[in-house]
Swiss-Prot record:
Family designation: Belongs to the universal ribosomal protein uS5 family.
GO molecular function: rRNA binding; structural constituent of ribosome
HAMAP family assigned: Ribosomal_uS5_B
Annotated organism of origin: Sulfurihydrogenibium sp. (strain YO3AOP1)
Oligomer and partners: Part of the 30S ribosomal subunit. Contacts proteins S4 and S8.
The protein's name: Small ribosomal subunit protein uS5
SUPFAM superfamilies with a match to the protein in the record: dsRNA-binding domain-like, Ribosomal protein S5 domain 2-like
InterPro entries listed in its UniProt record: Ribosomal_Su5_D2-typ_SF, Ribosomal_uS5, Ribosomal_uS5_bac-type, Ribosomal_uS5_C, Ribosomal_uS5_N, Ribosomal_uS5_N_CS, Ribsml_uS5_D2-typ_fold_subgr
Role: With S4 and S12 plays an important role in translational accuracy.
Comment on protein domains: The N-terminal domain interacts with the head of the 30S subunit; the C-terminal domain interacts with the body and contacts protein S4. The interaction surface between S4 and S5 is involved in control of translational fidelity.
Positions in coiled-coil regions: none
Length: 194
C-alpha cells in the first residue's frame, strides 16, 4: 500500500472537525533542530530545520516543520505549522483507549493503555507528543528499524489517528455505549461502572 500521507489524513480530520488554535491554551516543545549544509561556489550555506510539537494537555496535539537560515525563525515557522495541524484525540482517564500501531516509512510505534500511576513510559520523540496530548499513563515503544525523530513523530500521529473512542466503537458494533465504556475503564485501570 505504501506510505500513508499523514498530512492528508490530518487535513481530512481538520475538515471534519475544525479546531481553532487561538482558543486553546497551547504549550510548545521543540523535538529536533537539524543543521543542513549546501555547498555553493562561494562556500557553504547553512540552514536549520526544526520539528516542533504543540498541545494543550487536554486531548489536542499537533506537529510542524520549519526551515530557515537561522534557528529562531525556524522554530517560529515550525510552531506556526504545528498550530495548523492540531488534531483531537479520544483519551480515557489519561490513557489511550486501546492498543494501536502506527507506521511511517520504516518507523513503527506501539501504544498500549496503562493503569493509573504508571506514567508515560515512552522514549525519544514519542514522549513530548504524548505529554503535550495530555496522556498521563501509557506504555509506548518504537518497534521499527529507525529512530529518526521526524519518522517517529509521524508514526505516533498515525497511531493517534487510528484511535477510536468508546462512542465510535459502540456505534460500529451496535452495542450499548455504557457497556463499551465500562470495558475501557477496566482496561485503563479505572473503576468499572455497573
Amino acid at each position: 500500500m505504501g506510505v500513508r500521507n499523514i498530512e492528508r489524513l490530518i487535513e481530512q480530520r481538520i475538515k471534519e472537525n475544525p479546531i481553532n488554535p487561538d482558543i486553546l491554551n497551547l504549550e510548545e516543545k521543540v523535538v529536533e533542530i537539524r543543521r543542513t549544509t549546501r555547498v555553493m561556489e562561494g562556500g557553504r550555506r547553512f540552514s536549520f530545520s526544526t520539528l516542533a510539537i504543540v498541545g494543550d494537555r487536554n486531548g489536542h496535539v499537533g506537529f510542524g516543520h520549519g526551515k530557515a537560515r537561522e534557528v529562531p525563525p525556524s522554530i517560529a515557522k515550525a510552531i506556526a505549522d504545528a498550530k495548523k495541524r492540531i488534531i483531537k484525540v479520544a483519551l480515557i482517564e489519561g490513557t489511550v483507549p486501546h492498543d494501536v500501531y502506527g507506521e511511517y516509512d520504516s518507523a513503527v510505534v506501539l501504544l498500549k493503555p496503562a493503569r493509573r500511576g504508571t506514567g508515560v513510559v515512552a522514549g525519544g520523540p514519542m514522549r513530548p507528543v504524548l505529554e503535550l496530548l495530555g496522556v498521563t499513563d501509557v506504555l509506548a515503544k518504537i518497534v521499527g528499524r529507525t529512530t529518526n525523530p521526524n519518522a517517529v513523530v509521524r508514526a505516533t500521529f498515525d497511531a493517534l489517528l487510528k484511535l477510536k473512542s468508546p462512542e465510535e466503537v459502540a456505534k460500529v458494533r451496535g452495542l450499548e455505549e455504557e457497556k463499551i465504556k465500562s470495558v475501557y475503564r477496566i482496561y485503563a485501570g479505572g473503576v468499572p461502572v455497573r
